[in-house]
Amino acid sequence: MAQTPAFNKPKVELHVHLDGAIKPETILYYGKKRGIDLPADTVEGLRNIIGMDKPLSLPDFLAKFDYYMPAIAGCREAIKRIAYEFVEMKAKEGVVYVEVRYSPHLLANSKVDPIPWNQAEGDLTPDEVVDLVNQGLQEGEQAFGIKVRSILCCMRHQPSWSPEVLELCKKYHQKTVVAMDLAGDETIEGSSLFPGHVEAYEGAVKDGIHRTVHAGEVGSAEVVREAVDILKTERVGHGYHTIEDEALYNRLLKENMHFEVCPWSSYLTGAWNPKTTHAVVRFKDDQANYSLNSDDPLIFKSTVDTDYQMVKKDMGFTEEEFKRLNINAAKSSFLPEDEKKELLERLYKEYQ
């Protein structure tokens, strides 16, 4: 019998990666169809190789994508399908609004240098990837009755892609795309300051494109400071290490900065040492502005309920705190004000 959800009410999720939320069945299907070798030929086998049960380092976790992304990248049908199935997955989890993020370049095989995942050059550009994801998400919205928007990721190791990410955010603004992100390995020294990223973020500020940045996950509080002061981020992806700099943390508390918290992810990537108190406990105690999110459910063998169960069982989170953090997530979403108001009204009504 399925476990009763830790929070059985409508939820808002702001930090989840499309390419980390693919059904193993879909990976197998396209691996077979396209003649691409996968590390296993059953759903269970694939889940065990891609999935994680115990902590690995962030680079080891990122290496998991190498196993299965070649089955999906460069294939129009696969890309539209993973977007559609993502919406179905979230609807089943009781999520009523979700912002899903991905790098258009990592799904393309044309007009992208270098071509990712050792693919041969094809004819699928990053621009068309965004169009396909939009189609899949919009069809999913119609079919499953929830609201979905998307965030396009710049990648820390590829600053040359970032100007195009900004252009795609502008081109597809409100055609599901609501913001820009900076993802990838934040241990790359000085990557927040690479000119490609800085210029793209400056352009986003100028053009009214919303901004979030992965920072302080495994990186130091200094990476968070760079995200806030140089990249002018409006939300912090993860941000756990912010609390190591009291002055910065207190400043961000006062500024009502939103932290996109992914508890189960932080355990499995080693971003959080279980011998210490999790930053989210501090966020709760200080009534900070944060959300709970699943990050990469395929790899973490999880749903968003996994994160709620973890903080409820191990950290004493209450129903009232769950309501508060979801209302904060809605307030910190990148929806236009009128749609944000509608979402909030729905939550207030359902939470009475």
Swiss-Prot record:
Record carries keyword DNA-binding: no
Sites annotated Important for catalytic activity: 238
InterPro entries: A/AMP_deam_AS, A_deaminase, A_deaminase_dom, Ado/ade_deaminase, Metal_Hydrolase
Subcellular location: Cell membrane; Cell junction; Cytoplasmic vesicle lumen; Cytoplasm
Residue ranges crossing the lipid bilayer per the database entry: none
E.C. designation(s): 3.5.4.4
Residues with N-acetylalanine modification: 2
Family from the record: Belongs to the metallo-dependent hydrolases superfamily. Adenosine and AMP deaminases family.
Assembly: Interacts with DPP4 (via extracellular domain). Interacts with PLG (via Kringle 4 domain); the interaction stimulates PLG activation when in complex with DPP4.
Protein's name in the database: Adenosine deaminase
Species per Swiss-Prot/TrEMBL record: Rattus norvegicus (Rat)
Taxonomic lineage from the root: Eukaryota, Metazoa, Chordata, Craniata, Vertebrata
